[in-house]
């Protein structure tokens, strides 16, 4: 992220977050289609919902709550969400060795790093260049399990992909709320 106007920094961060969220959603669907019998999907989704680590972060749960928070707070939450996945996604490509969707998986880590840098650039701009130490995650997500012949591994990966999709949706929402608050545009209705 070279020096550029704040509006461009926000636009780039939102585009990166949207792309990552779409990639996470596509991956989740591809995994579900390949490994989870249709009759089990709903019950497994409900069981997995309680296991997202990000639920322990006191972050807003939707657009309305996000609008009550400052931009710096939303950037910090977004950064925490992104950083919590940097380790686990490095194992993602090994899980999907034969998948068309995951021809792009090797780049997921780079895309997350890109977004992390973009969020950090926004934080520097909004905090007058003096970033304060934020919350550091003492715990993060487990790595994806590469043993796809085990039911436990399948369920673990399914749950992780569900959380990955949810967390990227949150980060995208926070970035869009901030962008819309600062730069009213026609694309702000979501």
UniProtKB/Swiss-Prot annotation:
Q: Which CDD domains match?
A: somatotropin_like
> Where does the protein principally reside?
secreted
GO MF term list: growth factor activity; growth hormone receptor binding; hormone activity; metal ion binding
- Where is it localised? Secreted
Which Gene Ontology terms of cellular component type are present?
extracellular space
> Which residues does the record give as Zn(2+) binding sites?
19, 172
| InterPro entries xrefs | 4_helix_cytokine-like_core, Somatotropin, Somatotropin/Prolactin, Somatotropin_CS
Does Iron-sulfur appear among the keywords? no
Keywords of the record, alphabetical order, are: Disulfide bond, Hormone, Metal-binding, Phosphoprotein, Secreted, Zinc
The UniProt entry, under PROSITE patterns, shows:
SOMATOTROPIN_1 (PS00266), SOMATOTROPIN_2 (PS00338)
According to the UniProt entry, which residues carry Phosphoserine? 105
The record's annotation in Pfam families points to: Hormone_1
Its BP terms in the Gene Ontology are: animal organ development; growth hormone receptor signaling pathway; positive regulation of growth; positive regulation of receptor signaling pathway via JAK-STAT; response to nutrient levels
This protein's source sits in the domain of life called: Eukaryota
Disulfide bonds, paired cysteine numbers? 52-163, 180-188
PANTHER family, alphabetized: SOMATOTROPIN, SOMATOTROPIN,PROLACTIN
The UniProt function text for this chain reads:
Plays an important role in growth control. Its major role in stimulating body growth is to stimulate the liver and other tissues to secrete IGF1. It stimulates both the differentiation and proliferation of myoblasts. It also stimulates amino acid uptake and protein synthesis in muscle and other tissues.
Family statement drawn from the similarity comment of this UniProt entry? Belongs to the somatotropin/prolactin family.
Recorded protein name is Somatotropin
Q: Which species expresses this protein natively? A: Loxodonta africana
């Amino acid at each position: 992220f070279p020096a550029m106007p704040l509006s461009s920094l926000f636009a780039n961060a939102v585009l990166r977050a949207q792309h990552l969220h779409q990639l996470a959603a596509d991956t989740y669907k591809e995994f579900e289609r390949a490994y989870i019998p249709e009759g089990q999907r709903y019950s497994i989704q409900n069981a997995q919902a309680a296991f997202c680590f990000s639920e322990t972060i006191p972050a807003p749960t939707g657009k309305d709550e996000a609008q009550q928070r400052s931009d710096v707070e939303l950037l910090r939450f977004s950064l925490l969400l992104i950083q919590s996945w940097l380790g686990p996604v490095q194992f993602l490509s090994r899980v999907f060795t034969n998948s068309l969707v995951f021809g792009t998986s090797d780049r997921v880590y780079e895309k997350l790093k890109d977004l992390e840098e973009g969020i950090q650039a926004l934080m520097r701009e909004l905090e007058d260049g003096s970033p304060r130490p934020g919350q550091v995650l003492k715990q993060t997500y487990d790595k994806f399990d590469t043993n796809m012949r085990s039911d436990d591994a399948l369920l673990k990966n399914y749950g992780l992909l569900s959380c990955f999709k949810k967390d990227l949706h949150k980060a995208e929402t926070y970035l869009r709320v901030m962008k819309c608050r600062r730069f009213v545009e026609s694309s702000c209705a979501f």
